[in-house]
Amino acid sequence: MVTREDFFPGEAKLIRQMFDLGLDWLHLRKPGSGEDDYRALLMELSPYERSRTVLHEHYHLAPELAAGGIHANSRHPFPFKPTGERSEAKFADERGETAFPDMSHSGPTAAYSGPTAAYSGPTAAMLSVSCHSLEELSAHKAKFDYLFLSPIFDSISKKGYSGRFTREQLLEARDNGLIDKKIIALGGITAGNIPIIRELGFGGVAVLGSVWFSPSPVTSFEELRHSL
């Protein structure tokens, strides 16, 4: 789950309800946000929920608040240096289910150095990155625990942001081993297109618009979760 860009009343409550319903990872993405507001939202989450939250900004808060990971993107390309080759992230559901997917926090440990802190060892963060082409995906795949590829379908949250890949391109990437369990589909994801995502070999999905811009975000999340 990727958050809305803005902060809004009741956001933490909705997030916590989604965790209760089986949310695996939260990507906290608030472009241009102030550190105080960012920290305040994190502090409204439980320690467990923070351990499953990946930061897109204010990376130095990750070790301080025991966040689950940090995410590189075009706004913050490489504020850290991934160390060594990253093996495939572990996709094991801690609730004993066979849901698609769940990146267990017991997956590969990370060592990175952010702007103010070193962070390594058994409680270290997951490292992820956004990719918008198959070439980017190939270049970054070995360096990160998992990678977003987008937009797969026409974006719901960004009007006019159309799917970038043909079905044939994605099937070829799957058959060549480029798309596998480390790759997360983003962009236009709904419960209705989950079967296509499965066929294309993705390890999971990241959603934003189909949940947050619906009349009932928690209900929409639950429907999506049941389709996995």
Residue ranges with predicted function:
Residues 1-71, 75-77, 124-144, 165, ...:
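Conserved N-terminal beta1-alpha1 strand-loop-helix module at the mouth
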Residues 78-80, 91, 100, 112, ...:
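Aromatic (phenylalanine/tyrosine) cluster motif
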Residues 82, 86, 91, 95:
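Cationic, low-complexity basic patches in intrinsically disordered or flexible, solvent-exposed regions
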Residues 105-122:
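Long, intrinsically disordered low-complexity tandem-repeat segments
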Residues 146-153:
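Non-cysteine beta-strand/loop elements that form the S-adenosyl-L-methionine
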Residues 153-159:
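A short acidic, helix-capping loop that chelates divalent metal ions and anchors anionic groups
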Residues 166-172:
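Glycine-rich S-adenosyl-L-methionine
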